[in-house]
Amino acid sequence: MTPDILPSLRHLVRGLTAIFWGLPATLLICVLMAVAELPRALGCAPPIITTGMLLFGVCELARFQPQERAWQTALERAKLLALVNFGLAPFVYFWSRLPSETYYFQIVLALAFTGLLFLYQFNLVLQRLVAMLPDETLRADTRFFTRFNLALMVAGLVLMGGFHLLAELKSLPPAVIELLEVAQTARSRFALVVVLVLVPVSMTMSLVWKTRDVVLGSVFGPRS
């Protein structure tokens, strides 16, 4: 390995580490802001810090292989979404203080949507990244799990959009009305969040960590 590529790999590892910790931290902070008082006492700082970690991570990744057009294009899209999330993050705190304010609630919904888009796009970034790495097993695993993640998120969005569309209709068959009532229960919403968010986030974190290990192994050798 040439010494010239070592600084580039350092930025890559730093970016992957920031993404690995930033994903669950952002999700946890945004949820806690809605239900707990402790993070609210810190004001806007927690969601700004966690979304800032994601933005920092993507910016660090962009310093690896800047000549690869497909890789950089995928990163630019992820960076744009990370920047939007960073800009909208303070509204999580504002909404937690004034939950009845419709404007804040709509901004938080927009943040949830762009956050999901970021997760979607970052899975595409991982596909581009592992295509440049020499580990065939990692490429196969990433190809399978990112496709599964993307299909899961798209299906969840379609399902959620379908429920909202049906809820707006005036006349529906009794069976559909009963299904909508079940879907609106707290338990059903929790299950939807688990499928739509927690599963893709956990699998993405696993892929990020495996990719980081492969990069470190290429520099220092495999772990004993």
Residue ranges and their predicted role:
Residues 1-98, 109-155, 161-165, 180-184, ...:
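Membrane-interface extramembranous regions at the lipid-water interface
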Residues 100-107, 143, 175-196:
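Membrane-interface segments at the starts/ends of alpha-helical transmembrane spans
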Residues 163-174:
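Transmembrane alpha-helical segments of integral membrane proteins
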